[in-house]
Amino acid sequence: IIRLKMKLKKSPLAPTKFPTLPSVKGVNIGTSASNSKYKRRQDILTITFNNPASVAGVFTLSQMPAAPVQFCKKNIVNGYANALVVNAGIANSFTGKKGIENNRLIASYFSKLINSRQKDVYICSTGVIGEQLPVAKIKKALKNSFLGRKKDFKSAAKAIMTTDTFPKASGKKIKIGDEEISIVGISKGSGMIAPNMATMLAFIFTDALIEPKLFQALLNLGVRDSFNSISVDSDTSTNDTVLGFATGEAMVGKNVKPMSKIGDKRLAKFREALEDVMKDLAIQIVKDGEGATKLIQINVNNASSISSAKKVAISIANSPLIKT
């Protein structure tokens, strides 16, 4: 087994400091070390919710999606989540039936640990492809992570890093009516960054009260203009995943109806803040592109449609002549 020991030089485009983030009501964070691919670092992230959270997701378009992507895509139709589990270092991709079974074993173990249905637990993996997950080590780490669930978003962002040179996070606090709403996102990614996301994971958390179908529609739009609009090396991954979780705890129990329709007047502020967070995360991923020393934004004017404008922009972004 290859041990990932090398220390990566921090990107020259990295932010000078980690952002100050608001707390998100109903989100409990734990991290731990499985000692499976990395030594002496946290590589397991568990996030549990006080109550079932609305969930939305966008996944890789690769025709060979990794085992955890297949698992999440099956679960997402239920619309709600009790927990998120992420392991860094091993992607559980191109691992066949055993990889699918290992993913199921981990989900089954954690769902029993938190007294949840398995279909309400979401699993994500990132790292080296072609290796099986060390299930016993991960199970032990999951228990430690869950029992120590008093970590912050910075710890969470660090735990999911692989070849990243800095932890990535973004947050917004807005007011909807009389209620203060928080939106926080974390992400990882630095190589295999191409449109239709990248070798990347991104997780968005909010305490807004929003129905799953509407949340999914907003996430789709947000991904289109953020993670699906970046490129470093034009390669797409098998594990790309963006998941959004809405606990509703900033609004629930206050005689406030959930946001459920696109015409809801409260939605404008929320959508704008959500897209700001996602765009910030996407830009941070590009700034951490392997070997990147420059960041450019391509603007296309007078195109006949958004899709045609994007085709032009992507062809420019992926051109070796432009990059050199």
PLM region spans:
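Short beta-strand elements
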Residues: 44-50, 71-75, 84-85, 172-176, ...
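A glycine- and small/hydrophobic-rich beta-loop-beta segment
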Residues: 244-324
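Glycine-rich, charged/polar anion/phosphate-binding loops
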Residues: 24-34, 54-55, 168-172, 185-191, ...
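Glycine-rich phosphate/pyrophosphate-binding loop regions near the starts of catalytic domains
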Residues: 44-105, 122, 194-217
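Phosphate/pyrophosphate-binding loops at sites that engage ATP/ADP/AMP, CoA/4′-phosphopantetheine
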Residues: 73-78, 111-118, 283-290
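N-terminal amphipathic/basic leader segments beginning at the initiator methionine
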Residues: 4-60
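Glycine-rich, mobile lid/loop segments that gate access to catalytic sites or pores
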Residues: 104-105, 109-227, 232, 237
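Short, surface-exposed loop/turn segments at secondary-structure boundaries that line and modulate
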Residues: 84, 89-97, 119-138, 231-254, ...
